Amino acid sequence: MATPNVNTLWGQTVADELATVGIETAVLAPGSRSTPLAVAFAQHDDIEAVSLLDERSAAFFALGYAKRTGQPAPLVCTSGTALANFHPAVIEADTARVPMVLLTADRPPELADSGANQTIDQADLYGDAVRSYRTLPEPEAAARKLRSLRTTLCRAVGTATGTEPGPVHLNVPFRKPLEPLAAAEPPAGVPDGAVPDGFATENPLAARGRDGPFVEVHSGCTDPSATTVDELATAVEAAASGLIVCGPTDRPAPDAESLVALADATGFSVFADPLSGLRFGPHVDDAPVCGGYDAYLPALEQTPEVVIRFGASPTSKPLRQYLRDADARQFIVDPAGGWREATFTATDLVVADETRLATAVADAVDRTPGSYADRLAELEPGYWRLVEGEEPQEGAMLADAVALAPDPSTVFVSNSMPVRDLDRFGAPQAASLSVLGNRGASGIDGIASTALGAGFGTDDPLVAVTGDLAYYHDMNGLLAVSRAGVDATIVCINNDGGGIFHVLPIEAHESFDKWFRTPHGLDFEPSAALYDIEFARTDSREGFRSLYSEAVGSGETQVIEVQTESGHNHADRTALREAVVEELGR
């Protein structure tokens, strides 16, 4: 592609260098100031550009893609409020440790604080939510500047995908001409926007880069020290009981084989959150993976003496409370040295790669299961026998969503009640399911967009399960079905409002319905029609199973609305929990 001006040169350099470090997808929100970047990505042979019209949706789409693939999809937008709409997804990427690279176009620096149109202070807009921020220099056909640009881009991706993955923000100022047109004679005092003849020939390294990345960023894994392994192994060997807890995980998840080896060597059972990457997969046939703990923990009188914890804080509140109240030595394993344990009862922070630590400890101990593990081996299958066919209506939809999902497939589950019902009713199984959710900040915005972004990152079938309010929040995200060519089975559990508030004391207040449950009475069928998506509705488990089984195998997109009543489901959950505790506690 020709380089008629320095903006075109700058945009081409950005796209070329990002391609050398493995970037395969870019997400573009339309706008004028970002034209040099958009054109470069759109015309690049090795990068697939996706154009999404709404910045908030685009950012969540990129988030979902990175959650599924482990690689960022650079986000491009114009100046002004456009980049503010990226912010919710940036927060989720920060708190959930998801790689993200933001390329926000800006006006030339002399327009700052001038009242110029579509001009805001974009510096550090995202605050501490980004791993690093930099305003790039203005485009110029200067060898040192281009080498600096290439270096910055390589470092940005290295930081975004490093030991603590997360967002990196590069602010990119451009002055006109923004299009790939020859630069006009500039006004006095304004830099010439032309690329000198022979520039690339005279400066090949700056203009063309290297055969690979301009700068190779080598990210290492933190090996556990021998002292740490010995101390943990000693604690495990001395304990009468123990437990492995796997919460929502960062990509890549701890290697399943290493967790199987750890469970086998320690004799500890594994409590696997549905978002841990470890509740589903072939390894469950070889390890004591538990998923029903949310309901049966009150029936478990014993507590562990040692707990080894991987990932973020578990979804299950009963499990968090159980760990809080256990007089146990709790080892938090975190490769970035972060702290994600809000009850503040953990005793040890182990800064090490999770897979390497699990393997090292497994090699260092040889312990047989004790009475605590034996009790869990009774409770876990007993729980699933009790609840089979007895799940509350909403819980049954989550149980069926994973049980009937194709093998392999990607399942994205919304916050609020869906992820909790999946935690409670999604039985461990050997199918290869990649189950994802936005548990960093646990918002209900951007759910459809994140799910579709995850689907874009894989050839596996995609299932998205959302509540009605989350669906309402992100109906515009459905445009990605056609614009990005993503097929999905979207399950909308519609209980007409915020059903989760039934679990709070405010339920008894006279203002509960109007201000908290907030029934909306919306008919979602026209929303599917707006985006030319098939729509079906049911209010029964049998109807759902039939519609769902047909949809997941169709290779097309369909929204399946399941109508439920939140008050009844809350009462049914409570009654079932009490029945489980009574039966299993005997």
From Swiss-Prot:
Keywords associated with the record: Magnesium, Manganese, Menaquinone biosynthesis, Metal-binding, Thiamine pyrophosphate, Transferase
GO BP annotations listed: menaquinone biosynthetic process; organic acid metabolic process; sulfur compound biosynthetic process
Cofactor binding remark: Binds 1 thiamine pyrophosphate per subunit.
Name by which UniProt lists this protein: 2-succinyl-5-enolpyruvyl-6-hydroxy-3-cyclohexene-1-carboxylate synthase
Function: Catalyzes the thiamine diphosphate-dependent decarboxylation of 2-oxoglutarate and the subsequent addition of the resulting succinic semialdehyde-thiamine pyrophosphate anion to isochorismate to yield 2-succinyl-5-enolpyruvyl-6-hydroxy-3-cyclohexene-1-carboxylate (SEPHCHC).
Organism: Natronomonas pharaonis (strain ATCC 35678 / DSM 2160 / CIP 103997 / JCM 8858 / NBRC 14720 / NCIMB 2260 / Gabara) (Halobacterium pharaonis)
EC numbers, comma separated: 2.2.1.9
Pathway entry: Quinol/quinone metabolism; 1,4-dihydroxy-2-naphthoate biosynthesis; 1,4-dihydroxy-2-naphthoate from chorismate: step 2/7; Quinol/quinone metabolism; menaquinone biosynthesis
